[in-house]
UniProtKB/Swiss-Prot annotation:
Enzyme class label: lyase
Function per UniProt: Involved in the synthesis of autoinducer 2 (AI-2) which is secreted by bacteria and is used to communicate both the cell density and the metabolic potential of the environment. The regulation of gene expression in response to changes in cell density is called quorum sensing. Catalyzes the transformation of S-ribosylhomocysteine (RHC) to homocysteine (HC) and 4,5-dihydroxy-2,3-pentadione (DPD).
UniProt cofactor note: Binds 1 Fe cation per subunit.
Gene: luxS
Cofactor(s) recorded in Swiss-Prot or TrEMBL: Fe cation
Residues noted as binding Fe cation in the record, renumbered to the chain: H54, H58, C128
Oligomer and partners: Homodimer.
Protein name: S-ribosylhomocysteine lyase
Cross-referenced InterPro entries: LuxS_sf, Metalloenz_LuxS/M16, S-ribosylhomocysteinase
Highest rank taxon of the organism: Bacteria
NCBIfam families from the UniProt entry: PRK02260.1-2
SUPFAM superfamilies, per the entry: LuxS/MPP-like metallohydrolase (SSF63411)
């Protein structure tokens, strides 16, 4: 099985919250696509609660678009990581990490302004696969934690696993 880019970085040295360019590529027509690792939690030490990350998924996607789309950038998708330590964001364009970090913080401020669970987008049986598994309070706790800790930038060069380590891990 081919080694995915996300498994070539040392998760024991990752900071959180932090932005990292996980991958860049170009379409056959020359459009740049960038995938960002938006790391909310320190891997193997913290995890977002399932109800909170699910609610955040519904809120974060719209709020990030409000703050990041434009000037050559259009978000394709924002999805939670299976490990519940962050989100992957795929977009058209190549914004720098600081622009993404600023949009992320603004989106977290927006999450804190949501006053009622009824304001969560697509929170119904028709548009959500687990519509009863939500917690606005947990989502706001996550947002508050991001803002209190601030958002840093993780560097692929600093986090790269040495080839020897990858061989040792039989990858």
């Amino acid at each position: 099985m081919p080694l995915l880019d996300s498994f070539t970085v040392d998760h024991t040295r990752m900071e959180a919250p932090a932005v990292r360019v996980a991958k860049t590529m170009n379409t056959p027509h020359g459009d740049a696509i960038t995938v960002f690792d938006l790391r909310f939690c320190v891997p193997n030490k913290e995890v977002m609660p399932e109800r909170g990350i699910h609610t955040l998924e519904h809120l974060f996607a719209g709020f990030m678009r409000n703050h990041l789309n434009g000037n050559g950038v259009e978000i394709i998708d924002i999805s939670p990581m299976g490990c519940r330590t962050g989100f992957y964001m795929s977009l058209i364009g190549t914004p720098d990490e600081q622009r993404v970090a600023d949009a992320w913080k603004a989106a977290m401020e927006d999450v804190l302004k949501v006053q009622d669970q009824n304001q969560i987008p697509e929170l119904n049986v028709y548009q959500c696969g687990t519509y009863q598994m939500h917690s606005l309070q947990e989502a706001q706790d996550i947002a508050r934690s991001i803002l209190e800790r601030d958002v840093r930038i993780n560097s692929n060069e600093e986090l790269a696993l040495p080839k020897e380590k990858l061989q040792e891990l039989h990858i």
